């Protein structure tokens, strides 16, 4: 009899099977097999919050197949993902297969390589019940909030709405930022910049006014700037101080889940959901030419910065051979994880550092290659030497005013030869200064006054929202992608370029939640709940008690809100159309229902006339001349079709434009991305160009 190994996905099963050989059957559970059914609450509150799990609809045959395979096996190993969710899947599998939870049949693979699989199979353990209970508590908590609160929100605002323990706080953070922006009052200020040329030199350098005789200067109006400009007319400028120094810049640590999502958003333009999908593929295994199915990275749901000694030895050897010993730090770098990190895992790193991105590029999709290269570069750079910069700072004085100039040159590239961390906001660019000496006289080539106004705080991007959620301790990095997908798909938040902007629906819902359920959308309260859930995971808090403590207050608050708001309905603004109701003559309006927008008569319920809502793009169909309209799939992905469908079958994922191709006369389509492009879809043409700023 062979041994049975159960994992979540077919891709993972294929990779593991390659390493285990013929003595094992490796099958996939396709994720969870049991869950709380969607049709009802499925939590018995009176019986200590007992969950009522059921086999997930459509998985009955899969469960039968797993039972059949288990009966024919000598040993059964549960090899689901090494995290809270994976532990719960193993626990549910043990239940349906009749396996004792204290049996040592749980194995973990931090990386799906020969050594990773061998190590995992050599160290089986029993199911971690504390981890399972933490997952159950989180699941039941989310179910109580969602299933109790969503109907109330839907009744008061609009059908089909949802509320959630994490998603509602995420929306609040975005709404609060929008309120900050609206309330912001810009303040005027001025700067004065100069360009100087040292005596006997042709190279100029820039400096900014920093202080006067009374200290650091603040210029608040044009009159003050004019006076300073007048004071400096025909003044002699002298170098008062020159300070030369050395600055070391150390590499960033390897990725954890949250930083991978942030950096992939900034550098690659990937949404978090896309990042996690591709990372899962790289972890579970990709067919590499000459190697077969190979797991390329370690487990991607982690908040630990720990790196194994073996990985450090391998990457050190690679750096030494490829760059030379001078690119190695004096000793290997070890990074400290956050205090609440699950340190059982490693950071996200290549499972085999010797597999460079270019060596596997031919076997990867474009997205897989980009993300693997990002992970590989970041990890390798984290074990490289510091970048060393030679810095110069100079003070230039004239008539009691001091200008400051700074610059640097790279003396040794170190890790920056491979990887430079990006930021949401570009760092100030600094250039190298010419040779300067104290008491040197310099000529002022240009003196420029600049008017500025203080700027409101920036709207959140996906990257900065993830950073904020992590800093506030809301949710867990593994859930951020799903949270952002939820709040955008439910139209509480919309995307404008990279910015996340609250919709009217998001603001109305958040204001209702703040008024009636302040704890649910309170950042500190949500963070405390996360800390309590972590205590359950560590076995220091009982999960039933956690739920009981939460639910008592929540239930009272909900009952009071229902009583206080009985008969109250909050109304969203309705956009008027130019369509006149053909039944009663009123001007029809755009409404939003459970399944999206529609056009209705405002005379409801006396007049129940409704018509389909069509979003026109202003572009004519290239096939029949009809209107190109925006359509959405079941998952709300946008595509473009013809208003004359089904008579005309024009359809495109890319947005058509009114611009004609200069080569063949066909219409150009817009392809979105980090750098949007316009391209001609006419077969054999191939014309493409970068989209104008207005097109982006």
Regions from the PLM with identified roles:
Residues 216-253:
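Metal- or metallocofactor-binding catalytic centers and their adjacent structured scaffolds
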């Amino acid at each position: 009899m062979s041994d049975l190994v159960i994992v979540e996905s077919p891709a993972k099963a294929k990779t593991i099977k390659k390493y285990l050989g013929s003595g094992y059957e490796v099958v996939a559970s396709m994720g969870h097999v049991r869950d709380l059914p969607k049709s009802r609450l499925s939590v018995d509150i009176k019986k200590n919050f007992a969950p009522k799990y059921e086999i997930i609809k459509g998985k009955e045959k899969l469960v039968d197949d797993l039972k059949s395979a288990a009966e024919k096996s000598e040993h059964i190993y549960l090899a689901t993902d090494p995290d809270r969710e994976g532990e719960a899947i193993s626990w549910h599998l043990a239940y349906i297969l009749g396996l004792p939870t204290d049996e040592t049949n749980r194995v973990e693979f931090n990386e799906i390589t020969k050594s990773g699989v061998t190590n995992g199979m050599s160290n089986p353990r029993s199911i971690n019940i504390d981890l399972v209970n933490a997952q159950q508590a989180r699941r039941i908590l989310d179910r109580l909030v969602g299933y109790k609160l969503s109907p109330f929100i839907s009744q008061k605002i609009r059908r089909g709405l949802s509320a959630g323990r994490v998603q509602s706080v995420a929306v609040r953070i975005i709404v609060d930022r929008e309120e900050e922006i609206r309330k912001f009052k810009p303040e005027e200020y001025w700067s004065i910049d100069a360009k100087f040329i040292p005596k006997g030199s042709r190279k100029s350098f820039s400096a900014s006014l920093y202080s006067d005789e009374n200290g650091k200067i603040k210029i608040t109006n044009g009159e003050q700037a004019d006076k300073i400009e007048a004071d400096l007319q025909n003044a002699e400028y002298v170098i008062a101080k020159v300070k030369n120094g050395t600055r070391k810049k150390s590499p960033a640590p390897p990725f954890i889940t949250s930083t991978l999502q942030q950096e992939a958003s900034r550098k690659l333009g990937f949404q978090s959901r896309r990042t996690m999908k591709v990372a899962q593929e790289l972890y579970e295994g990709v067919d590499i030419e000459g190697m077969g199915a190979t797991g390329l990275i370690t487990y991607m749901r982690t908040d630990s910065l720990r790196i194994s000694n073996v990985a450090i030895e391998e990457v050190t050897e690679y750096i030494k051979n490829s760059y030379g010993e001078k690119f190695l730090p004096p000793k290997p770098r070890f990074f400290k994880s956050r205090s609440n990190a699950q340190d059982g895992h490693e950071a996200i790193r290549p499972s085999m550092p010797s597999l460079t991105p270019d060596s596997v590029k031919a076997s990867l999709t474009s997205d897989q290659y980009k993300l693997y290269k990002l992970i590989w570069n970041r990890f390798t750079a984290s074990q490289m030497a510091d970048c060393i910069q030679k810095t110069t700072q100079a003070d230039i004085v004239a008539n009691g005013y001091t200008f400051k100039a700074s610059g640097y040159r790279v003396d040794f590239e170190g890790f920056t030869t491979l990887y430079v961390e990006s930021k949401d906001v570009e760092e100030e660019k600094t250039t190298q200064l010419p040779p300067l000496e104290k008491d040197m006289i310099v000529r002022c080539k240009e003196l420029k006054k600049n008017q500025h106004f203080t700027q409101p705080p920036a709207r959140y991007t996906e990257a900065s929202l993830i950073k904020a959620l992590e800093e506030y301790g809301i949710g867990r990095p593994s859930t951020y992608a799903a949270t952002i997908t939820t709040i955008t798909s439910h139209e509480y938040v919309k995307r404008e370029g990279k910015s996340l902007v609250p919709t009217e629906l998001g603001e109305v819902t958040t204001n209702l939640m703040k008024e009636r359920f302040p704890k649910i959308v309170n950042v500190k309260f949500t963070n405390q709940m996360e800390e309590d859930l972590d205590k359950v995971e560590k076995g220091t808090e009982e999960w039933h008690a956690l739920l009981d403590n939460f639910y008592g207050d929540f239930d009272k608050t909900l009952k009071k809100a229902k009583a206080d708001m009985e008969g109250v309905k909050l109304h969203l603004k309705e956009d008027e159309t130019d369509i006149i109701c053909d039944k009663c003559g009123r001007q029809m309006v755009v409404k939003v229902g459970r399944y999206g927008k529609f056009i209705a008569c405002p005379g409801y319920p006396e007049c129940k006339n409704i018509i389909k809502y069509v979003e026109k793009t202003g572009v004519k169909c290239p096939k029949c001349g009809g209107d190109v309209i925006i359509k959405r799939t079941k998952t709300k992905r946008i595509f473009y079709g013809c208003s004359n469908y089904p008579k005309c079958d024009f359809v495109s994922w890319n947005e058509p434009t009114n611009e004609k191709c200069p080569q063949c006369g066909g219409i150009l389509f817009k392809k979105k991305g980090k750098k949007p492009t316009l391209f001609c879809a006419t077969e054999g043409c191939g014309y493409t160009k970068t989209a104008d700023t207005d097109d982006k």
